Swiss-Prot record:
Protein's recorded name: Tetracycline resistance protein, class B
Species this chain originates from: Escherichia coli
UniProt keyword terms in alphabetical order: Antibiotic resistance, Antiport, Cell inner membrane, Cell membrane, Membrane, Transmembrane, Transmembrane helix, Transport, Transposable element
Residues annotated as transmembrane: 7-30, 43-61, 72-91, 99-119, 130-152, 159-178, 212-232, 244-265, 276-295, 299-322, 333-356, 366-387
InterPro entries reported in the protein's UniProt record: MFS (IPR011701), MFS_dom (IPR020846), MFS_trans_sf (IPR036259), Sugar_transporter_CS (IPR005829), Tet-R_TetA/multi-R_MdtG-like (IPR001958)
Length: 401
């Protein structure tokens, strides 16, 4: 682990803060250009537009970081984000908001490249720990960002966008002057490697190498959209919670989630292996879903938050397993693909689970959790079956970082 690893964590923290900063004020900014009854539709489209661009372009940018190095792609992404936020800050028409989100989604590769830096600079046995820290950094940024954005929004709905632009400019300077390249692009002079980094064959290779792991990853991310989609609706309906109680619960979940990813995921993976960490995370999440389906008292939600947060150890461990099985010249492509899959669930999940919750609500508001639990049972069985094979035992395959 070197200074570039730590800088990758800082980049992720600041990137998440920038995303979180604008969320509280984006509806207010929209109100300057459109009628109130149209705000929800445009807000949803703007969020979906960013996610859709990430689905399309994150794999390509990840592959470019394999070909040209992590540093130039990071700098490109940070420039794109800075321009996006400045465009939003100075926006005087609706099309400027759409253009800004479009550009940010296209150039937003910081998450994939930061994960690639972790893969480049850490040993196989320590990778889950650092992927956990990466997830925790993003989570803390998403907690701090909306708080800062909420206060800054009291001054002007444009203020948080200036702050977000400043954060990205600062991060750009950090990468420019202190970040050392972690990808040896001289590896790409090998004919086979060079062809792969310049074509889409790398994705075919990844899908052939670990199809079940990618399916498990996508499915787990998709199920994770259930609480993200229905939490406010469910807690208001069953427990009569107001916005303050919902806010407390979400803040508590975010904080606990970061703690588990930072301090628990790596310890479990080191002591008992990545497979155990993945399974324990899925079991914790599925147990939380089972409790949420049946509890009738609001205070019982808070102990369940510990189980939900405990589920946060699964994906860093799974990401570690996949990274260990991936060659060094494919790490950027893998991390870009994972970002793409994650954002795809962010587009599909809210649409799918909002419809399911709405249609099942007249019968019973717990059905959404039972459906999620059923999917988790399938994922757990897949994980136990596939990850018992020797090649999935990442901790036993020490590869050079």
């Amino acid at each position: 682990m070197n200074s570039s690893t730590k800088i990758a964590l800082v980049i992720t923290l600041l990137d998440a803060m920038g995303i979180g900063l604008i969320m509280p004020v984006l509806p207010t900014l929209l109100r300057e250009f459109i009628a109130s009854e149209d705000i929800a539709n445009h807000f949803g489209v703007l969020l979906a537009l960013y996610a859709l661009m990430q689905v399309i372009f994150a794999p390509w940018l990840g592959k470019m970081s394999d070909r040209f190095g992590r540093r130039p792609v990071l700098l490109l992404s940070l420039i794109g984000a800075s321009l996006d936020y400045l465009l939003l800050a100075f926006s005087s028409a609706l099309w400027m908001l759409y253009l800004g989100r479009l550009l940010s989604g296209i150039t937003g590769a910081t998450g994939a490249v930061a994960a690639s830096v972790i893969a480049d600079t850490t040993s196989a046995s320590q990778r889950v720990k650092w992927f956990g820290w990466l997830g925790a950094s993003f989570g803390l940024g998403l907690i701090a960002g909306p708080i800062i954005g909420g206060f800054a929004g009291e001054i002007s709905p444009h203020s948080p966008f200036f702050i977000a632009a400043l954060l990205n400019i600062v991060t750009f300077l950090v990468v420019m002057f202190w970040f050392r390249e972690t990808k040896n692009t001289r590896d790409n002079t090998d004919t086979e490697v060079g062809v792969e980094t310049q074509s889409n064959s790398v994705y075919i290779t990844l899908f052939k190498t670990m199809p079940i792991l990618l399916i498990i990853y996508f499915s787990a991310q998709l199920i994770g959209q259930i609480p993200a989609t229905v939490w406010v609706l469910f807690t208001e309906n069953r427990f009569g919670w107001n916005s303050m109680m919902v806010g407390f619960s979400l803040a508590g979940l975010g904080l606990l989630h970061s703690v588990f990813q930072a301090f628990v995921a790596g310890r479990i993976a080191t002591k008992w292996g990545e497979k155990t960490a993945v399974l324990l995370g899925f079991i914790a999440d599925s147990s939380a879903f089972a409790f949420l389906a049946f509890i009738s008292e609001g205070w019982l939600v808070f102990p369940v938050l510990i189980l939900l947060a405990g589920g946060g150890i699964a994906l860093p461990a799974l990401q570690g397993v996949m990274s260990i099985q991936t060659k060094s010249h494919q790490q950027g492509a893998l991390q870009g693909l994972l970002v793409s899959l994650t954002n795809a669930t962010g587009v599909i999940g809210p649409l799918l689970f909002a419809v399911i919750y709405n249609h099942s609500l007249p019968i019973w508001d717990g059905w959404i959790w039972i459906i999620g639990l059923a999917f988790y049972c399938i994922i757990i069985l897949l994980s136990m079956t596939f990850m018992l094979t020797p090649q999935a035992q990442g901790s036993k395959q020490e590869t050079s970082a």
